[in-house]
């Protein structure tokens, strides 16, 4: 991931109807969505949306039905006309405003920069899996040898090699959506637009495909804008999340910020039943290294509040000379295969990173009775997550999720 914007929305308005100009004037006067619809017959689908997604990130647009998330997504490839504002898409070394560029420029961006995955798969029923995956390449006019190579590569990537000559009706829903993913990957577009791609699937299949998408993203590093109405899904896959209500972006933040600091009651209703264990990360929970107790007259610092686990730091801030209950100890990196119960019997402390999930910290604390030690990519001590930090994290999430309204906000359908 980089800090370079792949797509940037700048004060985007989308109005459907014949009297968009009048509707925009009323928007500027502070009129609400329902009032504008009544007065002009025009629907404000998106109102003053400003957000971005960096290269290699996943931005999730989420909200209730009618909140404007799909309407905003479809501005990126020009399927929806932007009434006001700019949608900047990185195309090579330059940026293109797809809201105002010439038609030939927009076609070029669609053909080479952007691909789309739909909720209902959008496969051609008369084409085999192989030909569905190659459809975008055929439209582009890709030479046959290159086309065949790319198609086979992407079919294998989504593990559908043995089904390449099957037709869509011969596949399960989950397999059909894998074909849709392979078709998007085959064009080698850098930006993928995914409009509730898994919502039509059974829960277990949906969760499995979410995991597959995360794994594929680790290798492909695409820029993805993903529409969802499911906060669990958004928190699981999103680098950043934009929560929308009645056409407006009400909060745009990383998942942990959404959970810990919801901006209003609408967002609090989404997070009220969230399990923080898979969302909150070590970096959010930890007691920083600078706050750890330094022992007077010694170079040791205490890694736990009881002082049973102690270490020194080298000149680069890396921990060494670990002592656990008076015995020389060792640091062992956390993994799901690690025998933590055995580690509790040895002079071992488990290490993770600022990205280690809260669930792992809970497991380490429960089975070893010691804090999780967080290290940076350079091995320097970042901090620790012990019992106190875990309780504090749970309390912060509980307080953040408290709702002060008597009932749910009215959805706009």
What are these regions (language model features)?
Residues 26-35, 90-98, 134, 138, ...:
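Conserved ABC ATPase "signature" region
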